[in-house]
Amino acid sequence: ILSASVAALCVFGVGFSASAYELNAEVKDVTPALREASTIGVWHHSNPDLQNLKNKDAILVMTFGTTFADTRAKTIDAVEAAIQKAHPDIPVFEAYTSHIIIDRVKAKEGIQKMTPEEAFSKLKAEGYTRVAVVSLDVIPGMEYSYDSIITKMQMSKFKELSLATPLMYFQGTEGEPDQVVDFLNAVKSQFPVMGKEDATLIMAHGTPHPGNAYYSVIQDRIEKLGMNNVFVYSVEGRPNLNDVIPKLKAKGFKNVTLMPIMMVAGDHANNDMAGDDPDSHKSILTKAGFKVNTYIHGLGENENVRALYIQRADEALAAFKK
């Protein structure tokens, strides 16, 4: 039913694209399921029953959230502010996808964060008819799947909906950009100056979702870019720290910098990675004979990364009908 090649259906600008598998010419009646299954890139839906409504646009940023107020201001809030600055005429709203974090922030700080459902209801009540959703996820894993599902559940309520891809999505196939390389070029400004005995370990979250395979792609691109002293590992997926330590020893590295590649520098960065407990990554590496430094900053603090999220917002807005 689907051909082997990917064809770009719409090109909105440099690096902006929404793609789909090219359907075989023999397919006469394209079912909604087939159309949905063949959609790649920015997702977009236009509700035929609401086309008479006036366009009133909003951007909704979806994030897992964090209970760390200091890193929230430097990361999530900073990304949202950057998107708002890039689109001054379109209001930016926010939704937290973690109900646990919503409850903890409310209890600790008295701040009420909205769930995605609450945010969509607010937008509907305030008369917004077109909503561009921007996910602050790094890869298309379990959390991005949740963002996708909950957005698609709103199709009957809005004239148009779109959902941007996460930070990394396309991998340079069929003329698409290699967003893994784009990501590495954005974060390499954080890497310390390294000598022959120095290595940097970038810590990802990890997931049981098949999207975990992106970490292998990241390592492949790291090597292709000649970053032979940079290694990716994850807290809850593969590769993990135990997979990387033998590589460090085999190459004779003695000094290691640990650095998270997560939106926020929250619990995983402060405790799992840089904590003083014997099972923290810092402690494990120190016990293994390495001198360890830590870089405790979330991706949202990086201006280059914020620029990539602005681009994701641009792509989601560009999907709307003119």
Mark where each language-model region is.
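Extended amphipathic ligand-handling, pore-lining, and cofactor/metal-binding catalytic surfaces
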Residues: 21-257, 263-322
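Sec-dependent N-terminal signal peptides of Gram-positive bacterial secreted proteins and lipoproteins
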Residues: 1-19
